[in-house]
């Protein structure tokens, strides 16, 4: 990431600086740069308007000056940082000494400006219920400050922790921003998770307060949150001081739909904020203060708590929203994601609001009431950019194959469509190009850890190349490495890794598990952060992301651990052992497939056990797992040391080439499994 321009940035008062030179790259060890000691290289400055090549060169040659200029230009600091960068490449600290507030940067700067105060900030849409709810920046500011007062009255203050378990409604954003205003760290849990998953996060995070809603709307279905929350609170040994439930009045229930029961001892959101004054103060937090913790699937059953700092994240968002997505103040952005995921945090809440956009908050499914739902919303609100998982577009394509429904909608306001969360397939790409009259359709690679785009097509300035993910964002250097840490050349497949140190906004630790962070990301390849994604770059510098290299599978853009599913399966009293793999699915991209070995006395009741296992996974992880495929086999392929060959099983099912390791215990097992796979596929043909 850093280059030889660093030598120009250091004044004599900065001691103990070590610059290690390598071919075309420079590494840094234990250095720091004061914001007042930067010797500006007048050759470089932030491009205006944005120019991808120019900013790439600037960030490569003068990285400290580059990020200092971004931070100074776009972020409101109550106290300017003393050092742009300090620490070392394995533990970078950005904007040390800086003091700010994320809520102030997202709301106050707009609500206090007479030009933007009455601009629409968020639009909540529930199409299946024909429900729309808009809030201006001034109104959202009021709502957030009032709820912040309610939390403050309950004793929530800087450094406290709050869990938010809510559907995609305005109140979810209000809760997040109120926490940020008070300096409390929030952890949003995806509403599709079942009670055990929620309990696990409450247990680990130990929040002072849990905030939820009584129900959410998913397509034509009402999802009840309070029964799941009650069960989670029962399962968790940690008991929060308070539980707040927003009882919705914005949606009219249909005949047969019943309000869920209340959570025992919970506080009603509306009663909590009744007749109280807005909390206009805001907590000043350090740049490194954790804005939020977001749990993501780990390679074992315990999810990883990704820590997001306030200062670096604010800087990264301001830069990427403007210069990756090409958005400017007053534009409208529609991210078809959930606030329980990083895309929701970045592209529905903090990113759009910090830049002064209008953000569409979508509650529902893209094919309900019909496959024109997204396109009608784009026409209705004159949306300028759409972000979606390919899965959602595949579902739309399935229900509107020739694009007739889409053709009835005016998409002229749309400047670009961004796809992320999983690999973009050519069929989805071509469908979107056809229905949008060849508007830019752009892949978008990033992850929970980065918090913002890594490889993409910034502001549509890179020629679109079929099947390529794109090129790195300014400020990032990527290399493709072999298992022995050798840098691979063009068109050679390996693990895609990031040259250290990482840019602002990228997590540099896991909550309560710093050693786990090192083991997961830093120890495998010295000098690099591993992404656990395989891929390659071509002769023109385009990166191609292929698949995960670990046991994380990607279901409709949701990352799930196969290990967590295995833990549920193996608890069944009739199961000896099991393996869960990710298999291709036309609609969802990838879904889990379970192979189980039954105890001998239960061989005759395989179908019964398989149905029980599907039910268990649904109850313990939730419908998000899409676990519907189970196959009983006599034995599993293993190495002589007892390791199950999951990767080979996955490739066998998906009809991919594979290499049998010399350490395999019994080759005959693979033949047996292959026969069983073919039988299964014949008896379970894909749905049309």
Swiss-Prot record:
Entry EC number(s): 6.2.1.1
Compartments reported by the entry: Mitochondrion
Protein's UniProt keywords contain Cytoplasm: no
An MF annotation (GO) of this entry: ATP binding
A single GO BP: lipid biosynthetic process
Domain of life: Eukaryota
Primary localization: mitochondrion
Gene Ontology CC annotations of this record: mitochondrion
Task of the protein: Activates acetate so that it can be used for lipid synthesis or for energy generation.
Assigned protein family: Belongs to the ATP-dependent AMP-binding enzyme family.
Protein's UniProt name: Acyl-CoA synthetase short-chain family member B, mitochondrial
Gene (UniProt): aslB
């Amino acid at each position: 990431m850093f280059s030889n321009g660093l030598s120009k940035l250091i004044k004599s008062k900065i001691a103990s600086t070590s610059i290690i030179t390598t071919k075309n790259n420079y590494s840094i060890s234990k250095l720091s740069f004061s914001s007042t000691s930067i010797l500006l290289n007048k050759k470089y400055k932030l491009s205006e308007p944005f120019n991808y090549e120019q900013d790439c060169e600037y960030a490569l040659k003068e990285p400290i000056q580059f990020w200092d200029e971004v931070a100074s230009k776009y972020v409101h600091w109550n106290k300017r940082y003393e050092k742009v960068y300090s620490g070392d490449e394995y533990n970078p600290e950005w904007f040390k000494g800086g003091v700010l507030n994320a809520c102030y940067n997202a709301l106050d700067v707009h609500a206090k400006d007479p030009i933007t105060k009455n601009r629409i900030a968020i639009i909540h849409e529930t199409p299946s219920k024909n429900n729309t709810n808009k809030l201006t920046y001034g109104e959202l500011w009021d709502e957030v400050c009032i709820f912040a007062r309610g939390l403050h009255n309950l004793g929530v203050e800087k450094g406290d922790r709050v869990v938010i378990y809510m559907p995609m409604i305005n109140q979810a954003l209000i809760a997040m921003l109120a926490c940020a205003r008070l300096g409390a760290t929030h952890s949003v849990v995806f509403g599709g998770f079942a009670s055990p998953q929620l309990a696990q996060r409450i247990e680990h995070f130990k929040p002072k307060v849990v905030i939820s809603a009584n129900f959410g709307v998913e397509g034509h279905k009402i999802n009840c949150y309070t029964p799941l929350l009650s069960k989670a609170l029962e399962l968790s040994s940690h008991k929060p001081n308070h539980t707040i439930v927003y009882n919705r009045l914005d949606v009219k229930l249909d005949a047969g739909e019943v309000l869920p029961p209340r959570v025992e001892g919970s506080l009603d959101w509306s009663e909590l904020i009744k007749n109280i004054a807005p909390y206009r103060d805001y907590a000043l937090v350090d740049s490194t203060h954790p804005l939020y913790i977001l749990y993501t699937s780990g390679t074992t059953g315990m999810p990883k708590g990704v820590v997001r700092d306030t200062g670096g994240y604010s800087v990264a968002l301001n830069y990427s929203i403007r210069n990756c997505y090409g958005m400017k103040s007053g534009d409208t952005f529609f991210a078809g994601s959930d606030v329980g995921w990083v895309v929701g945090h970045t592209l529905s809440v903090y990113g759009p609001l910090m830049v002064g956009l209008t953000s569409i908050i979508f509650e529902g499914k893209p094919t309900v009431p019909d496959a024109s739902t997204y396109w009608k919303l784009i026409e209705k609100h004159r949306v300028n950019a759409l972000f979606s998982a390919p899965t959602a577009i595949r579902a739309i394509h399935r229900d509107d194959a020739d694009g007739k429904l889409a053709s009835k909608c005016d998409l002229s306001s749309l400047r670009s469509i961004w796809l992320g969360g999983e690999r973009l397939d050519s069929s989805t790409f071509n469908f979107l190009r056809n229905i949008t009259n060849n508007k830019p359709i752009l892949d978008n690679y990033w992850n929970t850890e980065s918090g913002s785009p890594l490889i993409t097509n910034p502001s549509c300035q890179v020629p679109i190349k079929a099947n390529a993910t794109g090129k790195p964002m300014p400020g990032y250097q990527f290399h493709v490495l072999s298992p022995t840490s050798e840098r691979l050349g063009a068109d050679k497949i390996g693990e895609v890794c990031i040259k250290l140190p990482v840019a602002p906004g990228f997590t540099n630790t896991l909550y309560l598990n710093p050693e786990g962070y090192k083991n997961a990301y830093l120890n495998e390849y010295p000098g690099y952060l591993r992404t656990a994604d395989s891929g390659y770059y071509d002769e023109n510098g385009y990166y191609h992301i292929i698949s995960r290299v670990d046991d994380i599978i990607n279901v409709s853009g949701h990352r799930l651990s196969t290990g967590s599913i295995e833990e549920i399966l193996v608890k069944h009293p009739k199961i000896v052992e099991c393996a869960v793999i990710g298999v291709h699915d036309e609609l969802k991209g990838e879904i889990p497939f379970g192979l189980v070995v039954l105890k001998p006395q239960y061989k005759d009741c395989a179908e019964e056990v398989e149905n029980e296992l599907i039910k268990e996974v649904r109850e313990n992880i939730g419908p998000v797992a899409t676990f519907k495929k189970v196959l009983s086999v006599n034995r599993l392929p293993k190495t002589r040391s007892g390791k199950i060959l999951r990767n080979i099983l996955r490739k066998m099912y998906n009809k991919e080439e594979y290499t049998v390791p010399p350490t395999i215990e019994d080759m005959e097992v693979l033949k047996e499994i292959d026969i069983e796979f073919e039988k299964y596929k014949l008896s379970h043909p894909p749905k049309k």
